[in-house]
């Protein structure tokens, strides 16, 4: 398969799965394995195109985010929102920096596909239960959460360092368990994704830039644009979808993909 087509496939997988609780990294790694991509440059490629999906969030929420930036000097609400995002990101930032080498090594484990599939299944079951049994929501606005709530969500986000867990899944499940409305949980997860993924982009580029060179520029550009456009579409429609149907469809998707993945691994062909 030519590199440009691989870039389109990976860009679509990234953009379509980054902001729904199904583990974009897990799907990307399973796709990479299925396509037989062994060049380390593709690992760095996967991290780099995540920034495209994040820019989809920035584009969609630009007016609200810009209002926060402009209002920081004079508006307490803007400063409070910025502080909640910062507090929510600190635990994952710290854990990611401290464990970057360990995480990279773990992702080279020969049993990584099995770990991802099991994580998808377990995460799907947990999401299914929480979506149906979560306590009644007390906080309804993703831009006006309490500092305590933001800190607790940040701790849940650390679970996303494990393969197949899902950053959005861990933050959404954590949010709902502590009384945040579904829509607000999804939106706050979007907002936290911006600094977290920009940080992951910068850290991985700093540590792995030697794995890529000018010959990869075209594929990276294609993957970046595709992930941006597909991420934009997903974010645009996700909030209304969640309000009407909840997260149950995504829970079942995780379970089905995990079971199929294990079947492909262990059933003789």
Swiss-Prot record:
Segments crossing the lipid bilayer: 42-62, 83-103, 110-130, 142-162, 186-206, 219-239, 247-267
GO biological process, alphabetically ordered: cell wall organization; peptidoglycan biosynthetic process; regulation of cell shape; response to antibiotic
GO molecular function: undecaprenyl-diphosphatase activity
InterPro entries the UniProt entry points to: UppP
Topology relative to the membrane: Multi-pass membrane protein
Highest taxon in the source lineage: Bacteria
Keywords for this protein: Antibiotic resistance, Cell inner membrane, Cell membrane, Cell shape, Cell wall biogenesis/degradation, Hydrolase, Membrane, Peptidoglycan synthesis, Transmembrane, Transmembrane helix
Gene Ontology annotations for the cellular component aspect, listed alphabetically: plasma membrane
Record localization: Cell inner membrane
Main location: membrane
Enzyme class, first EC level, given as a word: hydrolase
Catalysed reactions listed for this entry: di-trans,octa-cis-undecaprenyl diphosphate + H2O = di-trans,octa-cis-undecaprenyl phosphate + phosphate + H(+)
Pfam families: BacA
EC number: 3.6.1.27
Similarity comment: family membership: Belongs to the UppP family.
Misc remark: Bacitracin is thought to be involved in the inhibition of peptidoglycan synthesis by sequestering undecaprenyl diphosphate, thereby reducing the pool of lipid carrier available.
NCBIfam families in alphabetical order: PRK00281.1-2, PRK00281.1-4, undec_PP_bacA
Role description: Catalyzes the dephosphorylation of undecaprenyl diphosphate (UPP). Confers resistance to bacitracin.
Protein name: Undecaprenyl-diphosphatase
Organism in which the protein naturally occurs: Caulobacter sp. (strain K31)
UniProt lineage: Bacteria, Pseudomonadati, Pseudomonadota, Alphaproteobacteria, Caulobacterales
Gene: uppP
